[in-house]
């Protein structure tokens, strides 16, 4: 495989990106975004999308490109190797669907000034547990949709910024107008057995 040939140490990341929780969270987000855009958003085609902490882009990039009319994708991650693999995994969307894909190797909390210059319709962050609050993120488009998820897996040190409720997530992101909010139960395995937690999305 590409990973084995180029970066065998990234096989664990690849396996984690295919885990049920990540798949379910990504699918849930894309389904709700699709519904929201069809019902409320003035623009339904040629969408410009910014993904923060895009990692390998799996499964989010294929889900977006196969289910929405995406014209541009901006994928932002601090890990340069993940970006290189993402370029390989998703190049056919650029070649066959003519989606303009741009990768950014940035550390999000220190790059709001640059990120806010990007003109997009949709901003996605599926793992705000691992990020500092996004209140400073505005993008160039005041009408942009922001779709984010977080969880309450605090005891595992899963992330630096877990939340305990939807209200906490709204405050963390700095959103006033909420078009969708929801909670989904998920499970993971710890040293002392199976644990249940809440995944929040707005």
Regions found by a protein language model. Give the residues of each.
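C-terminal substrate-binding/active-site "lid" region of AdoMet-derived donor-dependent transferases
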Residues: 132-201
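Conserved SAM-binding loop of SAM-dependent methyltransferases across substrates and taxa
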Residues: 56-70
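A short SAM/SAH-binding and catalytic strip from SAM-dependent methyltransferases
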Residues: 118-135, 152
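S-adenosyl-L-methionine
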Residues: 1-45, 81-122
């Amino acid at each position: 495989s590409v990973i084995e040939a180029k970066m065998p140490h990234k096989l664990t990341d690849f396996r984690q990106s295919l885990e049920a929780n990540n798949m379910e969270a990504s699918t849930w987000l894309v389904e709700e975004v699709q519904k929201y855009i069809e019902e409320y958003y003035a623009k339904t085609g040629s969408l410009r999308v910014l993904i923060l902490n895009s990692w390998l882009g799996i499964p989010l990039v294929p889900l977006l490109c196969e289910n929405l009319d995406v014209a541009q994708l901006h994928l932002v991650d601090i890990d340069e190797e993940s970006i290189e693999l993402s370029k390989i995994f998703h190049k056919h969307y650029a070649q066959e669907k003519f989606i303009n894909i741009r990768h950014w190797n940035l550390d999000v909390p220190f790059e709001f000034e640059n990120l806010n210059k990007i003109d997009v319709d949709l901003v996605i962050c599926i793992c705000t547990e691992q990020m500092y609050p996004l209140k400073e993120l505005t993008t160039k488009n005041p009408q942009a949709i922001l779709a984010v998820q977080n969880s309450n897996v605090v005891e595992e040190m899963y992330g630096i910024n877990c939340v305990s409720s939807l209200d906490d997530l709204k405050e963390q992101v700095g959103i006033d107008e909420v078009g969708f909010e929801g909670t989904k139960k998920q499970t993971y395995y710890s040293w002392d057995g199976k644990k249940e937690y809440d995944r929040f999305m707005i």
